[in-house]
Regions:
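Helix-start/capping segments and mature chain N-termini
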Residues: 1-105, 127, 134-339
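Charged, gly/pro-rich active-site loop segments
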Residues: 96, 105-119
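Extended, Lys/Arg-enriched charged tracts that mediate electrostatic binding to polyanionic substrates
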Residues: 115-129
Length: 339
């Protein structure tokens, strides 16, 4: 095995030993199979290639100070993948099989789970897609589930820090009654040009408003948004937003900290009233927002004058990571400790 510099891992793909596969045909899922190949063959007329029948997930495994490996809320990822399968008319992958695949992949690649002190983790990527050959626009009759893992470094190389976002109304994340609530590749392909433009302008990512009226906050890049004011954790409610497992967890922790939690429509003007703001998701847990510039109105909403994260964001970030790594007790049954 190559010598891995655990303290300087980036957030990218690195080959590991094994991946898990499962095929669906004749109306049923087969057994889980272990493969050491990074490649597979697929029919050139597969529905995934032509009509976007695809969904994926992202979750992590962490090595604790006690040496034990913990996987965070994989049951929630299994359910969300089933929702995405429903939304794209794919065969639903059973929750028990999903969790078995995660466990098997992490155990088989245990040597790639980074040491506790590195702050790194093992990223787990399940993907489900149509492999059946179809020329007409219709669901495939055959599907494949693949799950691979790769070690990734902490999202913030220079420590927990704020970044700027930009509102650009020329871009929509998804249609009002479209696929935004599902974790499908097409949503991410559609965001690439907006993300690139934001980066070119010096921002970490784009800040989306609702596609119908451009009045309400939707998402920030590929992450959920939250704002903090008057001891209240506020996050947008919309059928276009992917239900974030991280955001769901942060809402629970905020309530435990004595905060009020509101999930509702958030008008863009309300940005001016927030004491703190952040984007949340699997990759970073929380990405604190330094400011949000409105490209069209030239308005700027500043949440951190000194560039440092706010106290609530920092407390929530540290609390959730402590649970993930086993530094604090898991009182919610979120973590699966692998034997």
């Amino acid at each position: 095995m190559e010598n891995i510099d655990w303290n300087n891992l980036g957030f990218g793909y690195r080959k590991t030993d094994y991946n898990i596969r499962c095929t669906y045909k004749d109306g049923a899922w087969g057994d889980l199979e272990v493969s050491d190949s990074e490649y597979f063959t697929m029919h050139m007329a597969a529905s995934a290639i032509h009509y976007g029948q695809e969904a994926f997930e992202g979750l992590k495994a962490f090595r604790g100070k006690d040496g034990k490996i913990r996987v965070f809320r994989m049951d929630e990822n299994a359910k969300r993948m089933q929702d995405s399968a429903n939304g794209t008319l794919m065969a639903r992958f059973p929750q028990e099989k999903f969790m078995e695949a995660v466990t098997k992949a992490v155990k088989l690649n245990e040597r790639f789970v980074p040491p506790y002190e590195s702050g790194a983790s093992l990223y787990i990527r399940p993907v489900l897609f149509g492999t059946g050959a179809e020329i007409g626009v219709k669901p495939a009759r055959e599907y494949m589930f693949i799950l691979f893992v790769t070690p990734v470094g902490p999202y913030f190389k220079g420590g927990f820090q704020t970044t700027p976002f930009v509102i650009m109304r020329e871009f929509d994340r998804s249609a009002p009654l479209g696929m935004g609530k599902f974790k499908v590749g097409g949503n991410y392909a559609a965001s690439l040009i907006a993300g690139q433009k934001a980066h070119e302008l010096g921002y970490s990512n784009i800040f989306y408003l609702d596609a119908k009226e451009k009045k309400y906050i939707d998402e920030c890049g590929a992450a959920n948004f939250f704002g903090v004011k008057n001891n209240t954790y506020i996050t947008p409610k919309s059928e276009s937003i992917l239900p974030s497992i991280t955001n769901k967890s942060l809402m629970t922790l905020a309530e435990e900290m004595g905060m009020k939690v509101e999930c509702r429509h958030v008008p863009v003007e309300e940005l001016a009233t927030f004491e703190e703001a952040g984007a949340c998701g699997t990759a970073a847990v929380i990405s604190p927002i330094q400011r949000i510039d409105d490209y069209d109105t030239k308005e700027s909403y500043v949440f951190s004058k000194d560039g440092k994260p706010g106290p609530i964001s920092e407390k929530l970030y540290n609390k959730l990571r402590a649970i993930q790594y086993g530094d604090e007790p898991d009182n919610h049954g979120w973590v699966t400790v692998l034997d």
